[in-house]
Amino acid sequence: MSLFHVLGFGVKIGHLFWMLCCWFVSWFVDNGIEDKSGLLVGSVGDLEKTKMTTLKKKNKMWFWNKISSSGLKIPSFSYQFLGSVKFNKAWWRKLVVVWVVFWVLVSIWTFWYFSSQAMEKRKETLASMCDERARMLQDQFNVSMNHVQAMSILISTFHHGKIPSAIDQRTFSEYTDRTSFERPLTSGVAYAMRVLHSEREEFERQQGWTIRKMYSLEQNPVHKDDYDLEALEPSPVQEEYAPVIFAQDTVSHVVSLDMLSGKEDRENVLRARSSGKGVLTAPFPLIKTNRLGVILTFAVYKRDLPSNATPKERIEATNGYLGGVFDIESLVENLLQQLASKQTILVNVYDITNHSQPISMYGTNVSADGLERVSPLIFGDPLRKHEMRCRFKQKPPWPVLSMVTSFGILVIALLVAHIIHATVSRIHKVEEDCDKMKQLKKKAEAADVAKSQFLATVSHEIRTPMNGVLGMLHMLMDTELDVTQQDYVRTAQASGKALVSLINEVLDQAKIESGKLELEEVRFDLRGILDDVLSLFSSKSQQKGVELAVYISDRVPDMLIGDPGRFRQILTNLMGNSIKFTEKGHIFVTVHLVDELFESIDGETASSPESTLSGLPVADRQRSWENFKAFSSNGHRSFEPSPPDINLIVSVEDTGVGIPVEAQSRIFTPFMQVGPSISRTHGGTGIGLSISKCLVGLMKGEIGFSSTPKVGSTFTFTAVFSNGMQPAERKNDNNQPIFSEFRGMKAVVVDHRPARAKVSWYHFQRLGIRVEVVPRVEQALHYLKIGTTTVNMILIEQEIWNREADDFIKKLQKDPLFLSPKLILLANSVESSISEALCTGIDPPIVIVKPLRASMLAATLQRGLGIGIREPPQHKGPPALILRNLLLGRKILIVDDNNVNLRVAAGALKKYGADVVCAESGIKAISLLKPPHEFDACFMDIQMPEMDGFEATRRIRDMEEEMNKRIKNGEALIVENGNKTSWHLPVLAMTADVIQATHEECLKCGMDGYVSKPFEAEQLYREVSRFFNSPSDTES
């Protein structure tokens, strides 16, 4: 119990006490309690004495009525008045005694109350712990009992149901030993066969041993030290026997023993076969181990018997008896060892079938706390009763809380008046603040509704034309395009999707402010995302002549699990800033594991210009992560990530203008820019880096930067993902479609800058091309001259080509051996040109304009080498055949006020065989969907003029409900309604609005699903498959 509860309780008691005091004092005043000053007025006349007495009484009554009526505060004049009153000393002492006695009683009651609460909590704790142990023991026993019963079916099937039997002692022993983990509570399993007296001689001859009596003549169990199977007597003559023929190794000593020769076992066996259920014995010392245990027995029948079979029928159908031996002491001890609190309480298990004489099955009589909890145990045998009794080992602790609380109440009583005054004042102030907050809350809710509606409207209006562009590009991908055209379309699609994601930043800002921004957990291709981001900035980098490059370490898995959209958003923001402020040099994006920080290219500080991508100096990269909390002060890792996690570190390095020192402290502040001229010169809102920092934090990472004015900036962030590679999936460095014609080819890269050469090596090896890097042209020619391997192409950087092209081409013209490889020029700008006169006598080089991307490289090499084989576009999602089977012949109505969206949606559905009808408004949709009609589904836009999709859907549902009532009342014929007894057309919302509130409104107005624009095959399949199961549904 917290201090606040104690104070609150004290305030309530103090208030009650103050009211009692007021009542006592009022009673004293009413009874004419006078001070000694009344004795001094003897000379005054009776009339004057009467007037003075009456006046005093009126003053006293006014004072105490004011106090008792308010009961909340004591004004300063009340203290003065109280001090002026001369009470009789005897009555004052009585009042003090009443005060003391009252609070002593309150303290005693408080002590008793808290002590009883502690005792109740102790009882509840004991009950919970005891019930938990009883439940675990009961559950584990039931599991073992079910497996024993299953073995009885196994015996019936493979021993008695097979001729010859498929089970012998060796097979049974091996099987039970290997499956013992399924019966953790049993110490052994044995099977006894039913043998009639007439069959005994033949049975003993077949088995090779004599049926022996289980116990001695005194019916006492044999001690483990005296146990000798040969010394046991043969079983006496009786009508039938139950000798054990199969036994687990742990109880193999019971083979040949007659289970009917023991009193307890005989009753157990007879009851099991007559009832058809599992039967338990009373606890008894087990043979040989002499430990306390029970035997669970199931009868094995010749055939399956109905549940209502009579005992006589069951006896006649009995083949034998399967028993499981449970060592009670061991199984309870093993159970308690699994619990961390096993030393806290004492556990006793009893067989209480005979309530007057319970049998202790487990436990000791160690003295403990007198508190006891009894939990029933149900072991499947209704005739035997068991229970678990639990007690605490330690005595209850001293009630410190009760003593401290009761003492505190006495102290609090002296401050009751002040506490009441402060409390009432606080309550009054809180009530006023609460009223103000209610008013502000109403205003905020109204503003939030308006804001949500505004975001929904603006989001829809902006997304509608953009989705039309993306939809048309998707339809264009289904036409006959060559590889280059496909690359152009993919680039346009990537740019469009990136634009939509940038629009989403406006919506994300609202989520960030409310703290509701969440990340997805999906499988994605990291290298593919980097290629898409490069496509966004390739045009601008080529126009500026800035080299844009990406390098991803081969130690980074091909597939990761995380939020690809947010990761792309971070990269887009950082690279967008770099391309905005960089006029020359390079922008270099690297992705490594954190483990590689101090290795080779990612561990260097890039202090030497020759080690950079473009040869220009850059900001110290290591300074961008030196303040990360994940690393210690000396730069080494201070943590070890868990094995399934992939901890990436991504750096975006540029040679731009840099960030002024005075502006670096506010770089991540929302809506803050370096200076007022930045927004005029370069544009932007100033929220990109702020959103990026928030997203990095959600990815369990950190972000930092290092910047030097007039040199450049390097932004570095970390992010934690999960490994998306399947266990059986082989590593494939090329995540683009595999072009088999490049496999086995070899290329020589001529570049004297190691960082830039490694980027070229990275991209070409993704296509399966083996790459050799040399710094000069002479070394490339020497490599060709050696001729150890065939070189298919020579890649030359434009910087080297401009400097050494004359000598290089002359040497190629002199030696025909040098003409076989294809020349490829790697340029940074689209304006790069090659003199035709210079290349006389040789094939002009293929020009590849950076940034390098796998799809662009593949398309250019296919065209330049003449080996291109156009592959059909790869569609993700479910196979087209599945969607075609679902939509073939379906009549579908599409409702949208935008003609472009109508064309896109109609084209997407017609591609899968649907019969599409278009409507431009909700009013027309209502007229087309008035029952009876022949439509199978409707795709409804939400925001439309005249009547939106919500209202149109409500009216459609009203028409269907009215028609269903008419059919039910017989006012409309089923034949006239297409043999339909109930009308409910699947209506799917079709909109670009992705706000959650809009989704909820769709379902509320009667829509059945939600499809975002433009259609994605996977989402379309997921929605329509809920309503269309097979083409036969159309016919029906």
From Swiss-Prot:
Its EC number is 2.7.13.3. Disruption phenotype: Hypersensitivity to ABA, and strong drought and salinity tolerance. Reduced sensitivity to cytokinin (mostly in roots). More rapid germination, reduced requirement for light, and decreased far-red light sensitivity. Early senescence promoted by darkness. Reduced sensitivity to N-isobutyl decanamide. Defects in procambium proliferation and absence of secondary growth. Enhanced freezing tolerance. Impaired benzyladenine (6-BA)-mediated repression of the iron uptake pathway. Disturbed cytokinin-mediated flower development abnormality. Impaired meristematic development in seedlings. The keyword Endoplasmic reticulum applies. Induction: Rapidly induced by dehydration, high salinity and cold stresses. The modification 4-aspartylphosphate is found at D941. Residues 746-865, 891-1028 form the Response regulatory domain. Autophosphorylated predominantly on His residues. Activation probably requires a transfer of a phosphate group between a His in the transmitter domain and an Asp of the receiver domain. It is an enzyme of class 2 (transferase). It catalyses: ATP + protein L-histidine = ADP + protein N-phospho-L-histidine. Residues 1-8, 116-399 are extracellular. Interacts with AHK2, AHK4, AHP1, AHP2, AHP3, AHP5 and At5g43560. This is Histidine kinase 3.
